[in-house]
C-alpha cells in the first residue's frame, strides 16, 4: 500500500487530526498551527492523491477514509475535517465509534449537493467543474479557490494564500480532483450522522458560497446535541481569514464538551 504523508507537531496531550479540503494539502493549516500547538498534538496529512501523498488511484469516500484512518499515527483523536475533509472525517467517525474522541467539521456539509429543500451546490455546477478541469486544469482550480474566499474583506489575500498552498506541493491529478468532485456531488451522510456516538462540533462561515449558512440551522434541528458556530465575517476558509477567532472558538468548544485531555 502507498504511504500517506503525515506530519506531527505540537505538545498538547489531546491529539487533533486535521484533514484538508479539495485541491489543497496539509500546508493549508499553517495559519493556525502556532495557535494550537501548545494545546494539541497536531497530526497533519495530505489526503490520498494530494500534495505529498501521490500514487493513489481514484478512491471512493469510504476507501479514502479507511486509508487515512489505517495509517494515522494516533487514532484515538479529535478528527477535524475542512470541506471535503469534513466528509472524510465524518466517515471515519461513523466507521470507528470506539476510537474517535470527537468529530469537528469546518465549512462542511454531510450533503454538499443541493436537493429539494436542501441548500448546497447545484449538482450540474459540480459536474461542470469536472468538465472544466479536463479543459483548463489550472484555471478551474484557481476559480474554485476564489469561490472559497468570495465576500470576505481579505478575499484577495486569502485566495493568494490558498493558491500558494496548492503550488507549494505536487499537484493532484485531474483524475484525483474529479474523484473528489464526484464525492462532493454524490455523498449524503445526513441520516447516518444521526447515529454518531461521539461529540460533534460544526463550524461555518456566514459568507460561505459553497456551504450555505442555512445548512447550519437545518443540522441544528437534525443533530440537537451538536453545537454549531457561524463566523460572521468568514467565508469557506475561516481558519485562514480569521485564524485567531477560529482557534479561540475551537478551544472553547472543545472545553465546553470536555474533550481536551
From Swiss-Prot:
Cellular component aspect of the GO annotation: cytoplasm
Pfam family, one: Abhydrolase_1
The encoding gene: bioH
Listed name of the protein: Pimeloyl-[acyl-carrier protein] methyl ester esterase
InterPro entries: AB_hydrolase_1 (IPR000073), AB_hydrolase_fold (IPR029058), BioH (IPR010076), Carboxylesterase_BioH (IPR050228)
Binding site for substrate: 22, 83-84, 144-148, 236
Positions annotated as active site in the UniProt record: 83, 208, 236
Organism: Proteus mirabilis (strain HI4320)
A GO molecular-function annotation: pimelyl-[acyl-carrier protein] methyl ester esterase activity
Catalysed transformations (reactions): 6-carboxyhexanoyl-[ACP] methyl ester + H2O = 6-carboxyhexanoyl-[ACP] + methanol + H(+)
Amino acid at each position: 500500500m502507498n504511504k500517506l504523508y503525515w506530519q506531527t507537531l505540537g505538545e498538547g496531550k489531546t491529539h487533533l487530526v486535521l484533514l484538508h479540503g479539495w485541491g489543497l494539502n496539509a500546508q493549508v493549516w499553517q495559519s493556525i498551527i502556532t495557535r494550537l500547538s501548545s494545546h494539541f498534538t497536531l497530526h497533519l496529512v495530505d489526503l490520498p492523491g494530494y500534495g505529498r501523498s501521490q500514487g493513489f488511484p481514484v478512491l471512493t469516500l469510504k476507501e479514502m477514509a479507511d486509508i487515512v484512518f489505517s495509517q494515522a499515527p494516533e487514532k484515538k483523536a479529535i478528527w477535524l475535517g475542512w470541506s471535503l475533509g469534513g466528509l472524510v472525517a465524518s466517515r471515519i467517525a461513523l466507521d470507528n465509534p470506539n476510537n474517535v474522541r470527537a468529530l469537528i467539521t469546518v465549512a462542511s456539509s454531510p450533503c454538499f449537493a443541493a436537493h429539494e429543500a436542501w441548500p448546497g451546490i447545484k449538482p450540474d455546477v459540480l459536474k461542470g467543474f469536472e468538465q472544466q478541469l479536463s479543459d483548463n486544469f489550472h484555471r478551474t482550480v484557481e476559480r474554485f479557490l476564489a469561490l472559497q474566499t468570495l465576500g470576505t474583506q481579505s478575499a484577495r489575500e486569502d485566495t493568494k494564500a490558498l493558491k500558494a498552498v496548492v503550488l507549494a506541493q505536487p499537484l493532484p491529478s485531474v483524475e484525483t480532483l474529479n474523484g473528489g468532485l464526484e464525492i462532493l456531488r454524490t455523498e449524503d451522510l445526513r441520516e447516518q450522522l444521526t447515529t454518531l456516538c461521539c461529540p460533534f462540533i460544526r463550524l461555518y462561515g456566514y459568507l460561505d458560497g459553497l456551504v450555505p449558512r442555512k445548512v447550519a440551522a437545518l443540522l441544528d434541528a437534525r443533530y440537537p446535541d451538536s453545537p454549531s458556530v457561524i463566523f460572521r465575517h468568514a467565508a469557506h476558509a475561516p481558519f485562514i481569514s480569521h485564524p485567531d477567532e477560529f482557534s479561540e472558538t475551537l478551544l472553547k468548544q472543545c472545553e465546553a464538551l470536555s474533550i481536551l485531555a
